[in-house]
């Protein structure tokens, strides 16, 4: 489980009586979300944003995509990405932004675990077989990626808005 090394409320963007959002609350939003958005960087440095399904598991965000899709092509060139989720209600809610690097998951045991988690969360439409270091289903092959957080931001809206920042240990390499 990835745990933050620091938690900080940014007073510039928070009510004077706001408190930092707990990491547990942030993880709950990430885990319970059904739709996420991912931003990747194209070869020419233009951003690419798209909705997708995914999992928050063991302190990382996991998703799958076809190897020919734009986000997969972008990640091969530049692994930097941002994943976000939340709600679209101005008066209340908690939005979470995860900044990190996407790494391809190829280990069979991990892929089998993730395939089961996708099935549990999203149902039979997202049932995958694992072979050749990827997910497979009638729609074709899907590569699986994992985004371990470098930084996470939480944005609370409502009567006591606040912005919390969580920082994580730099990954080796």
Annotate each language-model stretch with its function.
Residues 9-37:
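Short, basic/aromatic recognition patches
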Residues 26-27, 72, 115:
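Short amphipathic alpha-helical segments and helix-helix/interface helices
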Residues 30-31, 76-77, 119:
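Alpha-helix boundary recognition
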Residues 29-32, 92, 141:
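A short, polar/charged loop/turn motif at coil->beta-strand junctions and beta-hairpin connectors
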Residues 23, 68-69:
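Structural motif corresponding to alpha-helix initiation and N-cap regions
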